């Protein structure tokens, strides 16, 4: 049975704990608590919770449970951490692609890989690269960020800023106008548009309370709302919905879009003049390892290369491929990719996410803000040659992020388009990026006016006579050198915008009650595959819902406080001042602790 | 204050401990970091890594030493554990030959995951158990020489050679880093541990109170 009360954590159970603190709640972890050998002499033969798969959700869950006091055995069938969130070397990707195409990795299909001979036997080695299977960005004000700080997992990681969000429109990449100051100073924006934009930004920061404004549009699309209610023009509507909101298509409903636009604006200027962060050395793969380490410090046991064969809900015994067994007193949690053979309860993964990851031999620093190595490019519906209906998002990371060596760059393209159209859209986006880059790199010759001339529409023309070769020859010579191209389709049960909907786990709960004779996975709970969402927003929600199913309540989810120096526990909870700085650089706003930001129009 | 900016040191070295379970890694860590003589009273900045600040050439060097958190038991140490490490100590138990034989495994795992320039020391711990010795000193010394590792036998129990082992490693790292900085004509002496790695973009520190417009681009990685 579940015990709703909080059990003492591993740290609390240690005798040394009580000499450090009188007050067991909130949990205070003494210095070096984790380094006292927390492990029993042999493999545990009984645990509270067994988790299979070391992806983001499972790892956050493992850490939350370990610190809550549950005895956790966390396994992965792979010889690396991360599962669906893994950050892999090129050699690991090669093996993974083979496994996908053999059908031994469920939830992925249609993996196609090109690797240049320059990697492995040439100038780059396989481990110079860290490729994420589901890359993510971290908003500066988000539930995951506050958990990272609370759990101190952020200390295992290094973060860099991401401030450049480009929108692709009319064959060029517009940099986003996202701060109040930028809106004011933007020469291209008509006065009326500026006013309307400011009005909208003021509204969106506190949209929920202003039902009279958005409620009439609740069932309509965001573009209707922005056009009719705020008189915004298409470029602004697209920027708001697709680059700031990072939505997937024009049919996005008003509340979802408002939520997502606010996410960006309130994240801006929390840690600096940027809304999002990226972790160095890789994204979810690094974060999940950080949470696994935290779980281990909290007492969880880790085993890789360990495959679950079956779970018997009557005896509560889980059996592994190596013949070992463990009794699980509470729950077995499994990632869909780690489902045992003869499983019958894996939830249907009906939504596709198409991904193309490229490594390009070109530093492409044009995409980045100074000092940064990350950028986001969004291709709104209808912006590509393919006539795309859904957005294509391209997340770009450079060598500064340490996921690729100097002189190279990684492009992560993805779309929520379903079926064969998706690959066409992604290819069109890739081509657009390639063309833009070639234009950029040839513009390096601009100083020599005799060689390069700008045409009326901004295209560079190369004086082929001067170069001693024909223009036709020039173009192929400048073709981008792709070091790596990986195309694959990932399946998930989470539709776009399903992020905060906890009912997805109820599917699993029903399954708990159903017993299918012969199934190897009766009584287990499946986690969700990563969705197409480019932010980490779904992770904490999912982990919390699972946590509640195991512990009975999520009240003490990461309810811990490390004994520490004067450091302020920076929580990611809404803070009025952050709203202020989110869009405001001057001191014209009088904040009285209310989340409502009322910027004065100074036009 | 300078603390807010993480400048209570000149250089920060991440050092990882590896080796089989039960060889005394955690005891070495607490022995070294709890016998503090450093001005930094807040030596522990994590629950499973600890720091001690030393002075070399008038520079304050903060050694941040990480323990495996038990993940070595089934050889499930995360690759992230090795990120940014400039030094490593491979620890075995002189009274347990299997722990010495496994040093090969730990060395290759280290080479696979850590920076190429990582400084490595081999430590034969539990030298107080001389009567139970299973690994001859000479053999380990040869192994260390062949693989260009520092070598010390220590006792975390009676603290013999513990400081010496860490200090030797830290000194070696310092020599590597200062040589590297000289080679580069480097000017960034303000606490980036990765003196040996490629130029990086600035790192955002999440610990300080956000939103005080003070640092967005602080270069302190921890």
From Swiss-Prot, chain A:
It comes from Saccharomyces cerevisiae (strain ATCC 204508 / S288c). InterPro entries: FAD/NAD-bd_sf, GDP_dissociation_inhibitor, Mrs6. This is Rab proteins geranylgeranyltransferase component A. Present with 23800 molecules/cell in log phase SD medium. Substrate-binding subunit (component A) of the Rab geranylgeranyltransferase (GGTase) complex. Binds unprenylated Rab proteins and presents the substrate peptide to the catalytic component B. The component A is thought to be regenerated by transferring its prenylated Rab back to the donor membrane. One of its GO terms (molecular function) is GTPase activator activity. The modification Phosphoserine is found at residue 470. GO terms for cellular component: cytoplasm; cytosol; membrane; nucleus; Rab-protein geranylgeranyltransferase complex. GO terms for biological process: endoplasmic reticulum to Golgi vesicle-mediated transport; protein targeting to membrane; small GTPase-mediated signal transduction; vesicle-mediated transport. The gene is MRS6. Belongs to the Rab GDI family.
